[in-house]
Amino acid sequence: ADLEAEAALLEVLRPTGLPILSEEMGADASFSLDRDGWIIDPLDGTMNFVRGIPVSCTCVALWRGGHPVLGVIQENGRDCVWTGGVGRPTSCNGSTVQCGNASVPESAILTTGFPRCFDFGDASLSETMRRLSQYKKVRMIGCAGLALAWTAGGMMDLYREENIFLWDAAAGIALVEAAGGHATFTPIDGQWRTTVTAGSPSLVAAEH
């Protein structure tokens, strides 16, 4: 399914002439984070999809000037399409949405996840539990794209994940920012991994 979705996306995006970074095929030779390009994840939440859990999506982001400026996420389980970016307020199936305005962790829902390369050593786990314990609720849905889309829609208050791939997060970052939220991330060219904090401006500020 992921390869079929990628083929369909490439058929649409190739005519634009912009280089592409995709989870499945990797990066075009000309793709660079300091140039315009597309970043796509044909199927985010693959394990959920394989196991029949209706929490997966397709993510497409337009990257410009070192930042995602447009995001589109097709939510498979609910047949919802999220769109948003610079000059385009975030919407879900055409209805405008906004980030939540939670100002303190004690009243907020955090959505997060553990990447496959997560450090499960004592020090890392202790710091992670300290961070998670601040929040009223914590949700791990196994799909970064939807976690960010749901944060943009106010269903979650903050998304934070370390060492996440750009193709998992780029579209969602654009959605959060276009919904009035803030996002911080520092991508590394050639590695395509970053740590993302996105959602309520007050909560993002509190994490830094």
Indicate where each model-derived feature is located:
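Short glycine/threonine-rich catalytic loop with a Thr-x-Gly-x-Asp
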Residues: 49-52, 140-141, 164
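Short, Asp-centered acidic motifs that coordinate Mg2+ and/or phosphate
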Residues: 19, 70, 109, 157-158
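Oxyanion/phosphate-interacting regions
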Residues: 126-130, 146-208
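Residue-level signal for inorganic ion chemistry
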Residues: 2, 13, 46, 75, ...
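Glycine-rich active-site/cofactor-binding loop and its immediate structural neighborhood
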Residues: 34-77
